């Protein structure tokens, strides 16, 4: 442990622009990407029932605010793209019942982050709150939607160093966006991410 505040500060300072960038994504960020895919799959299951509702949001967005430094944002976008490509390859090649398959990893993420809340969703809502779309969903119901949930996910580094912009279409019928946006200041002030 640390005995002095100055020792603590030396070991926990904020990243600087020229620090070495991690060469791999931390497990927590990989898990967050898997959670985003599972959330998108759940929303796809509920889409048919919700599409007529004024609460329906067709877009699916994930925000990663890893650093205010553009170099770090761009490098993170590259690592997330690589990881997403690995997930896609695994989904295409693995069998759901195989040990070590991506589907086992999805199920583990489901059990640790989703299962209890989704199966008991009504207990988390305020008394008297009624939302017909908040129905329990099981992993076995989500499993067939994982492939379609992954299809078309874009990874964008949204900053001043590149031309990538996050723009949601206004015209109908809307082609829903699935996007993982990595950024800093461009995404932090006055920008609304839809389906976050």
Question: What do these predicted regions represent?
Answer:
Residues 1, 6, 29-34, 38-55, ...:
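Short, surface-exposed loop/strand segments
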Residues 1-25:
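N-terminal switch/interaction subdomains of large nucleotide-dependent motors and GTPases
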Residues 10-14, 58-60, 194-196:
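Short acidic (Asp/Glu) and glycine-rich catalytic loops that position anionic groups and cofactors
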Residues 24, 28, 42-179:
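Conserved C-terminal RecA-like helicase domain
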Residues 178-182, 187-196:
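A short beta-strand element within the Helicase C-terminal
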């Amino acid at each position: 442990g640390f005995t002095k505040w100055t020792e603590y500060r030396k070991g926990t300072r904020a990243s600087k622009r020229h620090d070495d960038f991690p060469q791999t994504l931390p497990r927590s960020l990989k898990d967050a990407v898997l959670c985003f895919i599972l959330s998108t799959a759940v929303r796809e299951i509920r889409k048919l029932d919700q599409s007529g509702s004024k609460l329906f949001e067709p877009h699916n967005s994930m925000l990663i605010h890893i650093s205010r430094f553009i170099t770090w944002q761009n490098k993170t976008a590259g690592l997330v793209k690589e990881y997403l490509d690995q997930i896609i390859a695994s989904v295409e090649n693995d069998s759901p019942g195989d040990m070590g398959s991506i589907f086992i990893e999805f199920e583990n993420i489901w059990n640790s982050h989703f299962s209890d809340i989704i199966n008991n969703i009504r207990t988390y809502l305020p008394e008297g709150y009624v939302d017909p779309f908040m129905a329990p969903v099981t992993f076995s119901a989500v499993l067939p939607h994982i492939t379609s949930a992954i299809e078309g996910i874009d990874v964008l580094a949204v900053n001043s160093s590149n031309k990538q912009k996050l723009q949601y279409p206004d015209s109908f019928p809307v082609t829903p966006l699935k996007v993982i946006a990595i950024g800093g200041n461009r995404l932090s002030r006055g920008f609304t991410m839809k389906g976050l």
